Structure formats: C-alpha cells, structure tokens
C-alpha cells in the first residue's frame, strides 16, 4: 500500500461560517407548523432551482462548442485551487474546482489544512481502476466530513450531498469523493487511474463530444453521477 505522507496546500479558499439566531423557545403548535411548512417550501424551491440550473448546464455542455471543461487543461484558472499530495511514491499535483464542487473542495482543503490526511495510507489500490485514501482507520470504514456533528444542514450524520456538474467527469487523473451511496460523502477520496480507451461505449446523448474524446485516455465513466469529481491531477500521474 502506498503511504500518504503529507498534503501541502499551495492555494486555498476563504471559508465562510454560518450563524444561527434562536428566538423564544415558547411557541405555539400553529407557529411551529408554519415554520416547518416554510422551511420545507424553501428547501423545495432551492432544489427546484438547482435542478433547473443543472438542466441549463447540461444543455450547454452538450450543445455549446465553446463550453469549458476545466479538467481538459493543465492551466490553473483564477477560480481554482492547487494542492500537492506528497507520497512515498512521489508527488501528485492536483487542481481543484470550487466553482463546480464547493462542498467537496471546502471539505478537502479544511481537512488538509488541519492535518487530517497526514500519514494516511492509500488503503485501496486497484491497477487500471483507481487509488483511494482519506480514511484514518486505513481500512475503508472510517472518516467523516468537516461538518459532521457541527452543521446538520450540510451533514446530518451520514455525510454531505453529492455535487454533480456536467462539466466534470471521472476521467483518468480525476479526483473524486469515495462514498457508500448518494449523499454519504465524508473524508475519503480517490484518483482515477484506468488507462483503457472506453470512449466507444459512451452514448453521445449523455456525454459531451469533448469528454468522449478525453475518455480515450482512460477513466471510469461508470462512476459518473455517483461519486462527485472535484479535482484533476495535472502532474505526477
């Protein structure tokens, strides 16, 4: 197993905290009911807004010849962060995409800055598939997000939500969250390292032409939509 010796953050993000205001605890049942209904309505509206934006982004990714897929460039944009993962097998430089996966990037960078990942093992190494780490237990059963026990709006106890973007995919070199199902993201992550060309198997009505071309270099499209991609290796594969 490959040992993760240290993770050095070269550029980070400003992390914003959220406060809460508590009113008088003596409230009527009708008031409580109204509050719950308002909260539910707000959540529904928020989810609807996310869905509409996702549809717009998907249409753009599929039809716009000038659509930008950040993984396809080794250049680091102003809205991206860069980290270097130092391992016993060499350094891996990764650029992160907070614009498309803000929760995953914030979680990763915060853990890195606090030393959470220092000394951990790549406990799961599968040739022509991926390498996985981020578990303090070292066996794939541990780890948690930075919000567990602190912010139930982001992690109710089982992990934070999946972030999906039609601009990010599990290409070779992609950094993504390891999880046990939808919205169960904690601290574990993996790097795709499959080299096989499987582009011919990808449906053209689901994958943008540029991404199908990129999958000729390898990757794991079967993981798309299940494991949030939030970074891409730009040196050290």
Regions found by a protein language model. Give the residues of each.
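Sec-dependent N-terminal signal peptides of Gram-positive bacterial secreted proteins and lipoproteins
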Residues: 1-22
């Amino acid at each position: 197993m490959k040992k993760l010796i240290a993770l050095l953050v070269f550029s980070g993000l400003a992390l914003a905290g959220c406060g809460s205001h508590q009113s008088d605890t003596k409230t009527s049942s009708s008031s409580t009911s109204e509050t719950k209904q308002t909260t539910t309505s707000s959540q529904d509206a928020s989810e609807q807004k996310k869905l509409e934006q996702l549809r717009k982004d998907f249409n753009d990714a599929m039809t716009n010849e000038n659509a930008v897929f950040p993984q396809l460039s080794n250049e680091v944009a102003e809205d991206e962060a860069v980290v270097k993962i130092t391992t016993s097998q060499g350094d891996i430089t990764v650029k992160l995409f907070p614009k498309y996966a803000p929760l995953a990037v914030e979680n990763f960078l915060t853990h890195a800055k606090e030393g959470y990942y220092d000394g951990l093992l790549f406990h799961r190494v599968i040739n022509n598939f991926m390498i996985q780490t981020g578990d303090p237990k070292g066996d794939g059963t541990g780890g948690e997000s930075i919000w567990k026990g602190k912010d139930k709006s982001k992690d109710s106890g089982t992990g934070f939500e999946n972030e999906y973007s039609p601009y990010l995919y599990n290409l070779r070199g992609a950094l993504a969250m390891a999880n046990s199902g939808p919205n169960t993201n904690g601290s574990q992550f993996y790097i795709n390292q499959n080299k096989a060309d499987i582009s011919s198997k990808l449906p053209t009505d689901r994958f943008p032409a540029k991404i199908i071309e990129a999958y000729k270099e390898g990757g794991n499209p079967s993981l798309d939509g299940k494991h949030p991609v939030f970074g891409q290796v730009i040196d050290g594969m």
